[in-house]
Amino acid sequence: MEIPQLDRSNYLKGLLITARKDNQLNETEISIIKKFAARLGFSSDFFEETISHLLENKYITEEPIKFSKPDIAKSFIEDGLKLAISDDKIGDDETNWLIETAQMNGIDKVWVTKKMKEIQNKPHLIGKMDFALFSLI
């Protein structure tokens, strides 16, 4: 599937927002986001600059993101949940923001909750599981 550049940018932005919602970044989160940045076509210099200033960057707004297609939105929500739980806990801020983004894209909260439970039941697989985006591109 061809993913428009705006959706690519929003996908990465959304992952960055999700990662900073708990006011910390760990190595697992950084590694996951780096993989996404590369697959989405962003340079490693851009990634390094963005990630190094992520927590204090006030220019990254945190409004829920609207994607152009439901498949891209569902992929993002699933990957956002995997990223959020990669530090072994998922906070209310992370969950609420992902639910708001899902609802902005016409995705039911029940679907998000079900997907979150599926992922939480397999936390040991987070680093080994395929991310939803990778099946789209």
Where are these regions (language model features)?
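Small-residue-enriched hydrophobic alpha-helices in membranes
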Residues: M1-I137
